[in-house]
C-alpha cells in the first residue's frame, strides 16, 4: 500500500512535469511517470520521453499503455473492468455508453469505483508495472 511505503504521489500538469524530472535527474531521486498515451504512443510517449525511455537516466521511468485504443486512464479502467463498470454505472436512466460516462465524469467515476470495488478492480498493467518499479 502506497500510504505506508514512503512513496509520494504528485499530480503534475503536462506543462510542468519536465521541470520535476529535471530536478529528479539532478538529485538522483527515483521517479516514475504514469501518463496517458493520448491516442499516439509513438509521438506522445516514445518521442516526448525519449531520454527517459532509453535509460539515459536510470532513476526515472515512464509508463503508459502502449495500445493507442487505450488512450487514457478511464478507457483502460473500463476495458479491464467492463463487468464491474457496467454494473455500477448502468442505470435505467443511462443514455450514453458507460465508457463515455466515465470520460465525462472522471472524478465521480473513479471515486464510485474506489468506494464500491477497491478490492476487486483490476488496475491497468502499466500502472501495476510502474508501482512495482518504484517500490523496488
Task: List each model region and its residues.
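Acidic, divalent-metal-binding catalytic cores of TOPRIM
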Residues: 1-136
Amino acid at each position: 500500500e502506497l500510504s505506508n511505503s514512503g512513496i509520494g504521489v504528485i499530480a503534475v500538469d503536462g506543462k510542468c512535469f519536465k521541470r520535476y524530472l529535471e530536478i529528479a535527474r539532478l538529485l538522483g531521486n527515483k521517479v516514475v511517470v504514469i501518463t496517458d498515451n493520448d491516442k499516439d504512443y509513438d509521438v506522445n510517449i516514445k518521442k516526448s520521453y525519449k531520454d527517459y525511455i532509453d535509460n539515459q537516466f536510470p532513476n526515472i521511468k515512464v509508463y503508459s499503455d502502449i495500445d493507442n485504443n487505450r488512450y487514457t486512464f478511464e478507457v483502460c479502467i473500463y476495458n479491464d473492468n467492463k463487468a464491474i463498470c457496467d454494473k455500477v454505472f448502468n442505470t435505467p436512466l443511462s443514455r450514453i455508453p458507460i465508457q463515455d460516462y466515465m470520460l465525462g465524469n472522471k472524478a465521480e467515476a473513479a471515486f464510485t469505483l474506489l468506494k464500491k470495488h477497491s478490492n476487486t478492480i483490476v488496475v491497468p498493467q502499466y500502472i501495476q508495472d510502474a508501482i512495482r518499479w518504484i517500490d523496488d
